[in-house]
Structures are given as C-alpha cells and as structure tokens.
Amino acid sequence: MVKKHKFYTKEDLLCSSRGELFGKYGPQLPAPNMLMIDRLVKVTENGGNYNKGFIKAELDINPNMWFFSCHFIGDPVMPGCLGLDAMWQLVGFYLGWLGGKGKGRALGVREVKFSGQILPTSKIVVYYIHFRRIINRKLFMGMADGEVFCDGKIIYTANDLKVGLFQDITSFKKDFK
C-alpha cells in the first residue's frame, strides 16, 4: 500500500526514479538529467479544475542546467518538450500515488501551446496538473490538463495529457489499441 503524502521533496523524487517510492512494480520517474521536477508542493485526490485530482510541482532554474549549453549555442532556452515531458512525468507520478502498478508511458496529448520560454535568467518553474479522468481497467490511465508558469507568468498549456501504466511493455501497442 502506498503511503500518500501531500508533498514530496527532491530526495523523495529521486527515490521514485530508483523504483523505491512506489515499490518494485510501481511506476518510476526518470533519473536526473531527465527529471524535470525538484519538488511536489501539493498532491490531492480532489481539487483541480475538475475536482478529480491536482498536483502543483516546482523546478528551480539555474544557468548551469545541461540543456542551456546545447539548446541553443548563443541563444540558450530550455526545450519546450522538456516542460511537456515534466507534465507527463507528473501524471505518471500521480498514478503511482494512487496505487497503480506498471511501467509508465506517455500516450499523447491533444493540444500544446507555448507562449513563453524558460531562460538561464529564469528562477522558478511551477507546474499545475488538473486531472480530468482516471481509468482503471485493463490499462490504468490518467488524463489531465496542465499549465506551466515561469516566474509567475503562464508559458505553456497542455490539454488531454495521457499516461498509462503497463504491466508488460512488450505489449504496449497491443494494449493501447
């Protein structure tokens, strides 16, 4: 049984990346450098825009982060796909927090909009994930909308983020059809 906390530290998230937080068969977060979250400051089963679950998480930005040196040389900016991946990471984390088992896989997103950027001079990124639906059948799946704020300004939105937990990833395509 997963012990549900209302917040999680960086060390807790690193435990998740090692497969220690949700147990041997629970989903994992990626390890650094792909872990795009420093802490979860709020996790609830209710709340959010649809009253079906909510996460607020944060990432501290510093100019030495790995992607600034290569994306782009002379014009450093955090790749937008990393912010999108962070939202998928959070949906998968939530499925583990609910007690789901399996390996998490992003299954898509209906719409993503970018209206700002994360620069080396930025200080903090805040993610808001509003759960629309949790499906627990053959496939355990979460559907959510997300917002990304940088230094208090909304810069990305994503509608219908989807993440599923798979017992056997060799059947990934078959299970999703």
Swiss-Prot record:
| List of catalytic residues | 71
The answer to whether keyword Transferase applies is no
Q: What GO terms in the biological process aspect are recorded for it?
A: unsaturated fatty acid biosynthetic process
Cellular component annotations (GO), alphabetically ordered:
cytoplasm
Which residues, by range, are in coiled-coil regions?
Answer: none
Tell me which SUPFAM superfamilies the record gives.
Answer: Thioesterase/thiol ester dehydrase-isomerase (SSF54637)
Q: What is its EC number?
A: 4.2.1.59, 5.3.3.14
Assembly and oligomerization:
Homodimer.
Question: According to its UniProt record, which protein family does this protein belong to?
Answer: Belongs to the thioester dehydratase family. FabA subfamily.
Specify the protein name.
3-hydroxydecanoyl-[acyl-carrier-protein] dehydratase
Q: Which organism is it from?
A: Wigglesworthia glossinidia brevipalpis
The taxonomic lineage of its organism, from the top, reads: Bacteria, Pseudomonadati, Pseudomonadota, Gammaproteobacteria, Enterobacterales
| Gene from which the chain derives | fabA
